[in-house]
């Protein structure tokens, strides 16, 4: 058993898989979770680094799912949390089923907030711990045809900044917001966005590079990091661009049928 223990959510593929790989390489015992059986295959990959790996299949859109994840830690001190689990959804809001957009809200907002509250309390009590939350540059942009998803990431970006202020006197506890742009993961397929300009773009960011940027910022105790120079530029411009313009720009890349041949 290693001295260090980390939890990584959404770890079956993509950015979460890469974050779990980095944690295992750095000598952490890890508890990994995803809402699919693939998490067990991912755990086999992480075991090659010689540390203890525990995999949990749980739905983090529910309080019960988060509780099941934390119960799997068996009371062990959590030194590091990568709150990466998220859910995306494309198409026009009025065409979406309530159960589908509720899954976005419950996973990205409710489940994340509850998990952070449960993990941060003991971290603050002992003045030690690191938390990485996967936000998004989408939080800066009114997301036409991804309205609920972008709204959920706007919550995360604001929520993390507020927590950082509330906990500024908690020496030894840091919270870092990782804000990627479009990344080459299963996100767009799962969100039914492969027929969109952004979903079909072959030049998405490498999840391993995004994870490394987040990990480096986490270890350095930084408040936030935008991964990739194009995303840094886009997030900067979003602060000075009217919302109506941003929404139209987002429509052009996220509306169904905009995929380029």
Regions flagged by a language model, labelled:
Residues 165-229, 240, 244-247:
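SDR active-site lid
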Residues 92-93, 97-105:
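Substrate-binding pocket helix/loop in short-chain dehydrogenase/reductase
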Residues 136:
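Residue(s) in the substrate-gating loop at a strand-loop-helix junction
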Residues 84-89:
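Conserved NAD(P)H cofactor-binding loop of Rossmann-fold oxidoreductase domains
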Residues 12-13:
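Conserved glycine-rich cofactor-binding loop
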Residues 26-42:
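Conserved glycine-rich Rossmann-like NAD(P)H-binding loop of the short-chain dehydrogenase/reductase
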Residues 116, 152:
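Active-site helix of classical SDR
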């Amino acid at each position: 058993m290693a001295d260090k223990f980390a939890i990584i959510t959404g770890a079956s593929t993509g950015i979460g898989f890469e974050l779990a790989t980095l944690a295992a390489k750095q000598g952490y015992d890890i508890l990994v979770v995803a809402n699919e059986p693939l998490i067990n295959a991912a755990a086999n990959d992480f075991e090659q680094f010689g540390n203890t790996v525990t995999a949990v299949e749980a739905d983090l859109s529910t309080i019960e799912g988060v509780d099941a994840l934390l119960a799997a830690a068996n009371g062990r001190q959590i030194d590091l949390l990568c709150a990466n689990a998220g859910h995306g959804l494309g198409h026009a809001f009025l065409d979406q089923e309530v159960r589908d957009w509720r899954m976005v809200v419950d996973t990205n907002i409710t489940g994340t907030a509850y998990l952070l509250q449960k993990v941060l309390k003991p971290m603050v009590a002992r003045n030690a711990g690191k938390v990485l939350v996967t936000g998004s540059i989408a939080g800066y942009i009114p997301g036409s045809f991804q309205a609920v998803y972008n709204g959920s990431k706007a919550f995360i970006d604001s929520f993390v900044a507020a927590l950082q202020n509330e906990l500024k006197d908690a020496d030894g506890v840091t919270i870092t917001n990782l804000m990627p742009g479009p990344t080459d993961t299963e996100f767009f397929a799962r969100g039914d966005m492969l027929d969109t300009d952004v979903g079909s773009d072959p030049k998405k960011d490498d999840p391993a590079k995004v994870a490394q940027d987040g990990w480096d910022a986490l270890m350095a105790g930084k408040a936030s990091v935008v991964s990739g120079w194009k995303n840094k530029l886009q997030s900067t411009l979003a602060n000075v661009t009217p919302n109506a313009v941003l929404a139209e720009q987002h429509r052009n890349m996220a509306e169904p049928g905009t995929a380029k041949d």
